[in-house]
């Protein structure tokens, strides 16, 4: 339909794969490429299995690598890369603007517009966003999609965190360190766990947690 497209990627490697498989066939319709920082952007993020969710990487080398990949495909530097994730003040990005290594750069705000008078979200939520401190945002994998997602820690998310911490590995037969039979909450079933996990499971069960909410 001759509609311009703006792919969202989190690495030069991801763009290369998409470019070779599809985008190169309609290169004239490529309006821009959005680089979504997999550690700083909100919502679902494109963190790969090779990347550590607890060790954020500097976005500059990653965006530079993305531009180099675009150049390999013959895409001119006038095609913008849109930096998304962690953008609040443009003054924080002065060394990115008019930088020949990066080519044309634009910036995408996500959180700031939510705080405007025109924003339809509840005032209570706006006030909450204004009081967020370090550690209040969690990069988690609780989404049913299986992808990492970044969200503000609310009571529901905290309950999922606590539940996730009460997970133990088990075996359906004795193997390795899994030689202690789980004896709480699994009536009629045989599971073997490590001694440490058995003690933890007993403690959780004694605190009122069941197999369904351990």
Spans of features found by a protein language model:
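Conserved active-site-proximal phosphate/metal-binding subdomains
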Residues: 30, 38-59, 69-78, 90-214
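Glycine-rich beta-to-alpha transition loops that act as phosphate-gripper elements at the mouths
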Residues: 7-15, 77-92
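Conserved alpha/beta-domain cores
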Residues: 1-54, 65
């Amino acid at each position: 339909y001759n509609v311009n497209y703006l792919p969202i990627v989190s690495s030069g490697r991801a763009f290369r794969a998409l470019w070779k498989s599809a985008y190169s066939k309609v290169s004239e319709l490529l309006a821009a490429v959005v680089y979504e920082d997999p550690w700083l952007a909100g919502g679902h993020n494109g963190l790969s299995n090779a990347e550590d969710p607890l060790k954020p990487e500097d976005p500059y080398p990653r965006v530079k690598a993305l531009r180099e990949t675009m150049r390999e495909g013959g895409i001119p530097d006038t095609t913008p890369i849109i930096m998304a994730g962690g953008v609040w003040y443009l003054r924080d990005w002065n060394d990115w603007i008019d930088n020949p290594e990066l080519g044309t750069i634009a910036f995408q705000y996500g959180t700031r517009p939510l705080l405007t008078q025109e924003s339809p979200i509840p005032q209570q939520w706006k006030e909450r966003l204004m009081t967020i401190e370090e550690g209040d945002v969690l990069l988690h994998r609780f989404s049913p999609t299986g992808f990492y997602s970044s969200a503000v820690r609310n009571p529901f998310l905290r309950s999922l965190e606590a539940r996730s911490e009460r997970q133990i590995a088990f075996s359906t037969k004795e193997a390795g360190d899994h030689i202690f039979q789980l004896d709480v909450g699994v009536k009629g079933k045989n599971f073997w766990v490590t001694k440490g996990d058995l003690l933890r499971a007993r403690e959780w069960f004694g605190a009122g947690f069941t197999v369904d909410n351990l």
